[in-house]
Structure formats: C-alpha cells, structure tokens
A protein has these predicted regions:
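Outer-membrane beta-barrel porins/channels
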Residues: 33-47, 111, 117-486
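Short secondary-structure transition/capping motifs
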Residues: 21, 101-106, 166-169
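N-terminal, post-signal peptide beta-strand-biased segments of exported outer-membrane/organellar beta-barrel
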Residues: 28-134, 260, 415-417, 443
Length: 486
C-alpha cells in the first residue's frame, strides 16, 4: 500500500466507487488576507484613496504610511477610523465533489486604526504620534455534508455513505506603534515608527468519508479521516523609516519597513490521518493505516518581510492625485512550527521504512515561504462643494503564497489568488473636526482549481471553481484639538 499524505484514496475493485480526501503535509490565511499585504488600509481618507498615500498623507495615519511626513502635520488630533461593517465571501463550486460547494460568508466589525498626534516640544520641528491598528483580520468558516442510503445510491449493495468537511480559519494581527517625525526644512522631512505586533491564528480542518456495505450477507465498514489543527501566537518588533519631499505642486515619499524581529511565540499542532476498514474478512483490512500526533507549547516563528515603497502626489487647493507602489521581498522557506515528530503509526512497520520515515519525521512540521510581491495603488480626491470632498481609489493586492515541500495551502487561506480593491466615499470638514464615509469592494478573478476534497458518491468533479469578494463600509472621525503653537 502506498501512503501519500498529500492525497489519500482507495478504489474498490468490485464497485466503481472512489473515496478520496485531499490532505496537506502541514496545517493552514486566512482568509486571503493571510497572503495579502495590502488587504488592510488605514485612515478613512487613505483607505478610500486606495492606500496610495506614501507621498502625500496629511493625517495621523502617516505613522503607518510614511513617518517622514509627521513633521509637517500641524494639527494634533485624535482619529478613530473603523470598518463599521464588512462582509467577506469565498465560494468554491464543486470544492467538495460534484455539486458539493464550499462557501463562506462572514461579517466582521473591528477598529481599523486609532491614532493620535502629540506635541511634546512646543514650536519644535519634531512631531510625535501613536497608533493601534488592525494589520490583518480574517475569518473563514466552511462546511459540507453528504449522506445516502442503499435505496438512494442506486446500488443495493451499499447500505450507507456519509461524508463531511469542516474548515475554520481565524486570523487576528494587531500593531501598536509610536512614531516621530522631524521637519529638516520646509521641503524635506524624515521620521521613524517602531511597532510592537501581535499575531494569532487558529485553524482546524476535519474531513472524513464513511461507508457501510453489505457483501455476501456481511457488513464492511470503511472510513477515511483527516483531522488537523493549529493555534499559535507571535510577538514581534517592526521598524519603519520614511522620507518626504515637497516641490511645488508635487509631494514625494519613500519608506523602508524592516523585517520583523521575533520576541517570543508559541503554538499547538495536532494531526490525524487514517484509512480504516472493519470486516469479518481479514483480507478487507490489509490496507488499514493510521498516523496521529499532538504537540503543545512549541516554539512558533512567523516572519514579516522587508519592504520598500515610494509614492508621488500632485495637489492643488481642491484636487489631489496620488500614486504609490510597494515591493515586498521574498522570505525563504522556514518553519512556523517544527516540533519533534514521534507519531503513533499503524502498522508499525511504516516507522522503520526508508520510504516513509522522512514523511513521518516531518509529519508535524508547518513550513512557510513567501514570494516577492509588487503592489500599486492610485487615489483621487476633489472638493465638489463647500468642505465636501469626493474620494476615489483602486489598488492591487497580489498573493505572496509560495508552495513548498511541507507547505499547507489551506493554512494560507486557499493559496495564491490575487485581490483587487476599489473604493469611493465622501469627506466633510469643519473647523475642529472631519467626518468621512465610504464604501469598499474587493474581488478575486475566478479561477479553476482541483477540488479540495471529495465527500460524495457519483461522477467525480475534474475541477472546482474559486471566487471571492468583499464589501465594506468605512467610517472615519477626526477631532483637531488645536494647531501647533496655539
């Protein structure tokens, strides 16, 4: 019997029934956000302008986009921007077999950013800022069930057949930052932000098929099961450095974001894969197989990549047009979790097999790698009435997922589909405050993929159809305490 922990299947010679389950050599972003660096933007105005604010951000979200601009912000202010409502939808047609769709539709409400400015030194060229922002947030929940009896199957030999697929992937990443900017001259500024970050992810996949068949007046029970779960948390430090320059009607900016420096982190991982037959005839059970293990409080390592960004903005008293691009470098393969693997294996002969020992030794490993990504965004704003401004934005959000020998596509939010973001809204400004309201839409072009699993009987699906989209409402409020020097 050949065991393949990427894809397990068995075919019954006496009946054209294929039971197959796709499993991964390591457990699973989330929603797509886990592989997408531009899934979140910050500040209502910046979000609705496609995040294209490296060159011309003029509110306290500069602590994230470009701390080199902080020295030019004269209004110390407290800003609270939130995704009041967001719906994320992932659809995989035939994802669990022919006519067995996998769908997830989740509502989220969470703070996008809370940020403020502080003038510690009056009439100084220094400006200080602080922030708390949601860097990543994702939630996918999918399940599918299939059941049939002997009469419904069209074959009197089959007594019953049951299949199930349950998938949960939740991600939460929070960044806490303090930043400082210095106005070197009336045109040139520099700044830096230090972020302390928390990242937590919880993933669970349960996939099984069960069959009871009557053969020659005896019942034969067959089952295949995949059960795997990961839960981890990581704490890091990340630095961002920024430069800004103004020349006439143009603003330019550039930033560098350092790779993360791990402080500490831990996680749990458990897995089970089995193919079991129970029968009065020993020959039916010769291919039985079971492997399982569980590890807790293991060292967990997650890495954020080095990135560089540049942006330019053209501005007039009533109009802004901005463009930004950011390049994220590759991260070489590394282990999110790499516990010593000493699983229970049956038959025990597999433990001593040269063919299967490497697979068994790496059974609990969770490997990650990211490919380089270049994202770009464009934003436009125009005052259309007294203090009322329309905002428009668009941006790319390409996937960084890279398949490796021990990678788990499911842990990474279904792999490598790209996302495109569109946004529009309005901002209304008063002397001491401003309010911004807008809408966002994100989508992934549909693509054909192999089915993630097969939990039903009948003709097998050759391919599945993956698509996703997201709707959001952005509400921003900024209160200006006083201008510098007032």
């Amino acid at each position: 019997m050949k065991i393949n922990l990427k894809y397990i299947s068995f075919t019954r010679v006496y009946q054209s029934l294929l039971l197959s389950i796709l499993i991964y050599n390591n457990p699973i972003n989330s929603e797509a956000q886990d592989n997408h660096y531009w899934a979140q933007q910050y500040g209502a105005t910046c979000t609705l302008m496609g995040g294209s604010m490296i060159g011309g951000v003029n509110d306290n979200s500069a602590i994230y986009y470009n701390p080199g601009i902080l020295g030019f912000i004269d209004n110390p202010s407290l800003s609270v921007d939130a995704n009041v409502y967001r719906m994320d939808r992932v659809m995989i047609t035939d994802g669990a077999g022919k006519d067995m769709n996998l769908n997830s539709a989740q509502l989220s409400v969470y703070p996008q950013i809370i940020a403020g400015m502080v003038n510690l030194l009056k009439k100084s060229k220094f400006r200080f800022s602080y922030t708390m922002l949601t860097r990543n947030h994702g939630n996918i929940l999918m399940n599918a069930r299939y059941a049939s009896g002997g009469s419904g199957s069209g074959n009197p030999e089959v007594t019953s057949f049951v299949g199930g697929f349950d998938y949960v992937n939740q991600l939460n990443e929070q960044w806490f930052g303090v930043g400082a900017g210095y106005r070197i001259s009336e045109k040139f500024g520099a700044g830096a932000t230090l972020f302390g970050t928390y990242r937590g992810q919880s993933y669970q996949l349960t996939n099984y098929v069960q069959e009871v068949e009557n053969i020659d007046s005896r019942n034969v029970f067959r089952t295949q099961t995949i059960d795997e779960a990961i839960k981890y948390s990581n704490y890091h430090l990340i630095g961002k450095f920024g430069l800004s320059y103004t020349s006439g009607a143009f603003k330019l900016g550039a930033t560098l974001t350092t790779p993360s420096v791990r402080l500490f982190g831990s996680g749990n991982v458990q897995r089970e894969n089995s193919t079991i037959t129970v029968s009065e005839d020993p020959s039916d059970m010769q291919n039985n197989f079971l492997i399982m293990d569980r590890k807790t409080d293991e060292k967990a390592v997650y890495r954020h990549p080095l990135s560089i960004a540049a942006g330019i903005e053209y501005f007039t008293p009533k109009t802004r047009l901005s463009v930004t691009a950011e390049y994220f470098f590759r991260t070489d393969p590394y282990y999110l979790l790499k516990p010593a693997s000493v699983p229970f294996v049956y038959p025990t002969s597999y433990s001593d097999s040269a063919d299967y020992k490497p697979m068994i030794d790496s059974y609990m490993h969770v490997e990650i790698a990211t490919r380089p990504v270049l994202n770009a965004g464009i934003g436009f704003s125009r005052e259309i009435y007294k203090n009322l401004t329309i905002l428009l934005g668009a941006s790319t959000d390409f996937s960084s997922y890279e398949d490796t020998k021990e990678a788990n596509e499911m842990l990474s939010g279904f792999g490598s589909f790209d996302i495109y973001h569109l946004a529009t809204g309005f901002s209304y400004s008063l002397v001491k405050q401003s309010v911004t309201l807008g809408f966002t839409y994100a989508f992934s072009p549909s693509e054909n993929i192999p089915p993630y699993t097969v939990i039903n009987q009948g003709p097998a699906a050759d391919e599945a159809h993956l698509s996703s989209y997201s709707y959001g409402i952005i509400l921003g409020y900024t209160y200006y305490f006083s201008r510098s020097g007032e």
